[in-house]
Amino acid sequence: MSNLTDLFDLTGKVALTTGSSIGMGRALAEGLAIAGAKVVISSRKADICENTANEINDMVGEDRAIAIPCNVGYKEQLQRLVEETHSRLGPIDILFNNAGVNPFHGSASDIPDEAFDKIMNTNVRSNHWICQMVLPDMIAKKDGVIVITSSNGAFMPSTELGTYAISKAADLALVRNLAAEHGSNNIRVNALCPGVFKTRFAHVLWNDEDGSERSAAEITLKRFGEPEELRGVSVFLASRAASYMTGEALIVDGGRVMVR
């Protein structure tokens, strides 16, 4: 390999991304497509998925993105997502699990059972399910990459986002166990742990003028992240540039956890 940029080339790879129609997930999918991968855009709303796929194709100048809607909380929809990806694009080389929810802000002592179950089902169990579905093909070809979006919240206690943080800490355990189980099959599994980015999902954390100013002051870079800043991160984790990295948690939060 004579050119360093070849390490980041994903040409011909099939990447299935969940929670990728807007926000951070979209930026992650954009990065993969820019690097040459064929990308599945997936979230609950079909029209938004189609729009995102079309805009990514316009951006890269060719048809690299397709839309397959899916609610990851339902096992049968995940199975259809995996099967349709395989039938339309081929075996999955890269699985990027980004879908997540947080329907509750407040003390974990007050969270209703329904909200707790929804967080754990979407943020943890769905990742377990889809990995089970994708791994057989990766094992057969002895090659594959899985990335699960966790959070810097997995490393910090929270008085308002406690249950969400618990789910993201569980994702780290899932990543490490999958990495340990499947390393002998040349399957790498890592976690991406972002901080606060300017997305609709995190708007309550950055869109409150007084509170957001205080929060930004706690970040080493003194600002919140822009979704586009995750494009290169997604490519690194999915590419040969990270070929000797597995079972790790890559924190991308502007230095917030470092100074907690």
Where on the chain are the PLM-derived regions?
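Residue(s) in the substrate-gating loop at a strand-loop-helix junction
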Residues: 151
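Active-site helix of classical SDR
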Residues: 131, 167, 175
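Substrate-binding pocket helix/loop in short-chain dehydrogenase/reductase
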Residues: 106-108, 112-117, 215
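Conserved glycine-rich cofactor-binding loop
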Residues: 14, 19-23
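Short C-terminal tail/terminal secondary-structure segment
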Residues: 2-6, 102-105, 156, 235, ...
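Active-site loop-to-helix junction immediately N-terminal to the catalytic Tyr of the SDR YXXXK motif
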Residues: 111, 157-165, 177
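Alpha-helical segment proximal to the catalytic Tyr-Lys
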Residues: 136, 180-184, 243
